[in-house]
From Swiss-Prot:
Protein modification: Specific enzymatic cleavages in vivo by viral protease yield mature proteins. The protease is not cleaved off from Pol. Since cleavage efficiency is not optimal for all sites, intermediary molecules are expressed.
Additional information: Foamy viruses are distinct from other retroviruses in many respects. Their protease is active as an uncleaved Pro-Pol protein. Mature particles do not include the usual processed retroviral structural protein (MA, CA and NC), but instead contain two large Gag proteins. Their functional nucleic acid appears to be either RNA or dsDNA (up to 20% of extracellular particles), because they probably proceed either to an early (before integration) or late reverse transcription (after assembly). Foamy viruses have the ability to retrotranspose intracellularly with high efficiency.
Alphabetical keyword list: Capsid protein, Cytoplasmic inwards viral transport, DNA-binding, Host cytoplasm, Host nucleus, Host-virus interaction, Microtubular inwards viral transport, RNA-binding, Viral nucleoprotein, Virion, Virus entry into host cell
Pfam families: Gag_FV_central, Gag_spuma_N
Consequence the record notes for mutating residue 43 to A: Induces deficiency in replication; Gag is mislocalized to the nucleus
Annotated site (Cleavage): 182-183, 210-211, 223-224, 488-489
Source species: Feline foamy virus
Compositional bias (Low complexity): 419-430
Molecular-function GO term, any one: DNA binding
Name under which the protein is recorded: Gag polyprotein
Amino acid sequence: MARELNPLQLQQLYINNGLQPNPGHGDIIAVRFTGGPWGPGDRWARVTIRLQDNTGQPLQVPGYDLEPGIINLREDILIAGPYNLIRTAFLDLEPARGPERHGPFGDGRLQPGDGLSEGFQPITDEEIQAEVGTIGAARNEIRLLREALQRLQAGGVGRPIPGAVLQPQPVIGPVIPINHLRSVIGNTPPNPRDVALWLGRSTAAIEGVFPIVDQVTRMRVVNALVASHPGLTLTENEAGSWNAAISALWRKAHGAAAQHELAGVLSDINKKEGIQTAFNLGMQFTDGNWSLVWGIIRTLLPGQALVTNAQSQFDLMGDDIQRAENFPRVINNLYTMLGLNIHGQSIRPRVQTQPLQTRPRNPGRSQQGQLNQPRPQNRANQSYRPPRQQQQHSDVPEQRDQRGPSQPPRGSGGGYNFRRNPQQPQRYGQGPPGPNPYRRFGDGGNPQQQGPPPNRGPDQGPRPGGNPRGGGRGQGPRNGGGSAAAVHTVKASENETKNGSAEAVDGGKKGGKD
C-alpha cells in the first residue's frame, strides 16, 4: 500500500539538491538522512514515487512505496537532507532495516567510480584480530574490577583517604624581600585609617629597596605589607600607580570622600603629610579635577605671595593636565626659595633675642607704686603718718582708696598719666557728679568750684580715694573726732605734707568743739 507523498515539499527537496523540480511517475529515489535520532552518521532509504494508478489515471493523493535492494548511485536519484525535513515530503519515512540502511556499503562491496566508495577501505584480518584482543582485555579488566568491588563491600568501606598535599604553586614574578622592606619602613600601623598615609610616606623608601616596574608587582608588595588588614587588599587594577594604590587604601579605610567634605579632608592630610600628598589624594578623589583641587589647595599654601607666584606659573601652561604634572615642581621650587619644608614651616634656625626692658618715659603714678611696694590689705585702722623724703613716690598709691581712680602725682616730677578718667556712678550717698577729686563740694553736696585750688588742705575737699564729706564707710562716725578727717589725707610733696598736717590738726580740734 502506497504511503502519502507531499509533492510541494518534494519539489523543494529537488531544488535544495540541485535537481529539476519535476519528479516523474515510477522514479526511484535514494534518500540519505544526514542526521537523526540514531546519532551521528548517515542512514539510507530507497523509495519509488507513485503518481498514477494502473490504468494511467492520476491519483488524487500522490504516494510512494519502499523499494528493496541495494542503492545504485548510477541509476537512482539522490536526495539528501535532515531527518525531519525529509519526513515532511515522505510522510512516516524511516531508514531501511538491515544492511540496506548503510546505502552503497550495504553489501560490503566497492563500486568503482562512485565518489562515496573511493575512500572506503574494508577492515583487514589483522585488524580484526587486534580488535578481538582489545575486547578480551576489556573483559578481563571488568572481571577484576568486579572482584575488587565485592571484596570492598564484604569488608566494609570506610571514609575516603585524603589525597596528598598539593605541591606549592611556582612563584609568579620576583621574590619580594618583605622582611627587608619592613626593616626599612617599619611595621604596618595597627589602625587601618593610618595605613594609606603611612604607605604614602614610604613609597620612596620602597622604590629604593625594591624597584617596582609593573602594577602586578606593586599589588603584591602592597598586599604583603597590609596583610594584617585583610579588608585593605588591592586588586591589579587598583595598583596601577602609587597614587592610585594610596587612594584605594584611603577609600577602603575612610569611605568615599564627599565633595562638600573634601576641603576638610585635604586640610587634615596637609597638616599630617604635607601639601604634595594632599594634592595627589585630591586628584585621585576627584578623578583629576584640577579646578576643584587647586581651589582647595591654594587656601592651604602659606602666604598670598606664594599663591600669586604659583598661579602666574600655572597660567602660562596649556591645559589642566600639564598643570597637574608640573604642580610638584612648581611648589617644591617655591618652598625651596622661601626656605620652607613640606608642611610650609621655615627650616631656618630661629634666633631668640631677649627684648630690652625699657622704662617708660612718663610712668603713671599707679605703675610706680606697684613696682615699689605691694598694696596694703586694710587701711581702716591705719593712722596718719607723714611720708618720708625717700618714700614720697612709693607711698602715694598706698593711701588711696581701692575704689578710687588712679591720679597723677601733684607737685612732683614723676610725669603725668594720660589715661582717661571716666566718671564713676553715684554711690554711697555722694553727689550727682560722683566722686571727682577735681571738684569741690560745699554744703549739700553741690559743686562750688570747677577746679582744685592751688594748695588744698585736708579740710577743703576730697582727695583721690577719699570721701567729700570727711569720712567713709568703715572709718568711724561722721560727727566723730578730728582724726577721722585726717586719716586719708595724702600729700605729694614734703612741703604740702607739712602744711596739710598742721591744717588737719586744726580742723580736727574745731570739729571736736562743734
